[in-house]
């Protein structure tokens, strides 16, 4: 058997998931914000780019599978009144309610996220939440929620659904786990988050 290396030609800058209009994108703003806030965590590097590419590939597969089940679709790009582009994973209507769907794949542990009794059976983690009351995620998930709240603000909906594929589950042992949460934000939460990101774009990045 002869074996030779082969270049995979994957786009390790994460720009291959679809057409991007020229101009400022929402992801540039919140990525810049978190890189400044926690440079050690968001420092980048070759290994992080490989993980990003793998995560993006998983997200595309999940997006295609979930969009039909949610009676939704990937809607393409939206643009804010400031001229900022953003691309939700899924937009679905449940009756007259618009639901923003966001899909993530991560190597972080599911051990500290809100886990309902039913989810506990999937994760192997003791339940820490009843499944309906107010709950919070660990700080390391903040960037997910910044993205979701900014998108929801501009879509004028308080409703979102977050899907997370935990590649290594709770790490004890490393086993994939797929979890989902319905989210409902207050108008204040959405406005506060977008105001902070807009201020960062204006005062720090100086791009709007």
Question: What do the PLM-derived regions correspond to, one by one?
Answer:
Residues 1-100, 105-129:
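Metal-dependent nuclease catalytic cores that hydrolyze phosphodiester bonds in DNA/RNA
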Residues 76-205:
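Nucleic-acid nuclease catalytic cores
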């Amino acid at each position: 058997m002869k074996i030779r290396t082969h270049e995979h030609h994957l786009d390790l800058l994460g720009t291959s998931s679809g057409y991007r209009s020229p101009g400022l994108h929402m992801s540039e703003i919140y990525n810049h914000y978190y890189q400044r806030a926690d440079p050690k965590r968001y420092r980048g590097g070759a290994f992080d780019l490989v993980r990003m590419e793998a995560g993006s590939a998983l997200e595309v597969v999940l997006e295609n599978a979930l969009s039909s089940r949610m009676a939704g679709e990937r809607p393409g790009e939206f643009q804010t009144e400031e001229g900022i582009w953003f691309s939700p994973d899924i937009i679905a209507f449940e009756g007259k309610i618009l639901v923003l769907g966001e899909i993530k794949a991560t190597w972080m542990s599911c051990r500290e996220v809100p886990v309902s009794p039913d989810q506990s059976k999937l994760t192997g983690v003791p339940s820490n939440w009843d499944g309906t009351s107010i709950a919070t995620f660990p700080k390391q998930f903040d960037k997910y929620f910044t993205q979701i709240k900014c998108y929801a603000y501009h879509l004028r909906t308080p409703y979102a659904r977050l899907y997370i594929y935990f590649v290594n589950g709770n790490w004890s042992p490393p086993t994939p786990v797929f979890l989902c949460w319905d989210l409902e934000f207050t108008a204040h939460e959405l406005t506060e988050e977008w105001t902070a990101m807009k201020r960062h774009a204006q005062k720090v990045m100086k791009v709007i």
